[in-house]
Amino acid sequence: MPQLDTSTWFIMIFSMFLTLFILFQLKISNHYYPENPMTKSAKIAGQHNPWENKWTKIYSLLSLPPQ
């Protein structure tokens, strides 16, 4: 049974990781990141939801009359 030649595995794996690292660095460097991001206020004022004006009742199955 022949032996598996693993002498080039280190170079291949190392070059793969190096290439992936460089590609990700190039991809990330193309994005614009603001220097001082403003924090958003957690308080939302004046937002109107269509379901706020409606009165709804959730019926429990046990409270319905028997059929």
UniProtKB/Swiss-Prot annotation:
Gene source species: Canis lupus
Entry GO CC: mitochondrial membrane; proton-transporting ATP synthase complex
Membrane topology reported for the UniProt record: Single-pass membrane protein
Keyword Mitochondrion among record annotations: yes
Entry's localization field: Mitochondrion membrane
MF (Gene Ontology): proton transmembrane transporter activity
Location of N6-acetyllysine modifications: K54, K57
Membrane-spanning segments: 8-24
GO biological process, one term: proton motive force-driven ATP synthesis
Record lineage: Eukaryota, Metazoa, Chordata, Craniata, Vertebrata
Protein family per UniProt: Belongs to the ATPase protein 8 family.
Keyword list, A-Z: Acetylation, ATP synthesis, CF(0), Hydrogen ion transport, Ion transport, Membrane, Mitochondrion, Transmembrane, Transmembrane helix, Transport
Its biological purpose: Subunit 8, of the mitochondrial membrane ATP synthase complex (F(1)F(0) ATP synthase or Complex V) that produces ATP from ADP in the presence of a proton gradient across the membrane which is generated by electron transport complexes of the respiratory chain. ATP synthase complex consist of a soluble F(1) head domain - the catalytic core - and a membrane F(1) domain - the membrane proton channel. These two domains are linked by a central stalk rotating inside the F(1) region and a stationary peripheral stalk.
InterPro entries membership: ATP8_mammal, ATP8_metazoa
Gene: MT-ATP8
SUBUNIT field: Component of the ATP synthase complex composed at least of ATP5F1A/subunit alpha, ATP5F1B/subunit beta, ATP5MC1/subunit c (homooctomer), MT-ATP6/subunit a, MT-ATP8/subunit 8, ATP5ME/subunit e, ATP5MF/subunit f, ATP5MG/subunit g, ATP5MK/subunit k, ATP5MJ/subunit j, ATP5F1C/subunit gamma, ATP5F1D/subunit delta, ATP5F1E/subunit epsilon, ATP5PF/subunit F6, ATP5PB/subunit b, ATP5PD/subunit d, ATP5PO/subunit OSCP.
Keyword Amino-acid biosynthesis found: no
Residue numbers bearing the N6-succinyllysine modification: K54
Identification of the protein by name: ATP synthase F(0) complex subunit 8
One matching Pfam family: ATP-synt_8
